[in-house]
Amino acid sequence: MATKIKFKYKGQDLEVDISKVKKVWKVGKMVSFTYDDNGKTGRGAVSEKDAPKELLNMIGKK
């Protein structure tokens, strides 16, 4: 089963498959990321403590 990242963006609860994540970086205690949203670039952020290990392992990698 693929890992899903659950996060809030502009008041909406969203979920994205980790395979769609493009770039991951850390801002303070938050982990920010961009992902492929059907041809558009989506953005999201999740707290470091709530982030899946797979996402944390992607920090700084392309």
Curated annotation (Swiss-Prot):
The molecular function terms of the Gene Ontology recorded here are: DNA binding; RNA endonuclease activity
- What happens to activity at different temperatures? Hyperthermostable.
Is this entry keyworded Cytoplasm?
A: yes
Keywords assigned by UniProt, alphabetized = Cytoplasm, DNA-binding
GO CC annotations on file: cytoplasm
Alphabetized InterPro entries for the sequence: Chromo-like_dom_sf (IPR016197), DNA-bd_7a-e_arc (IPR003212)
SUPFAM superfamilies in alphabetical order: Chromo domain-like
The UniProt pH dependence field says: Highly stable from pH 0 to pH 12.
Work out whether the entry's keyword set contains Ribosomal protein.
no
Locations listed in the record: Cytoplasm
Q: Which family does it belong to?
A: Belongs to the 7 kDa DNA-binding/endoribonuclease P2 family.
Q: What does this protein do?
A: Can constrain negative DNA supercoils. May be involved in maintaining the integrity of the genome at high temperature.
Subunit structure as annotated in this protein's UniProt entry: Monomer.
Q: What is this protein called?
A: DNA-binding protein 7
- This chain's source organism reads Metallosphaera sedula (strain ATCC 51363 / DSM 5348 / JCM 9185 / NBRC 15509 / TH2)
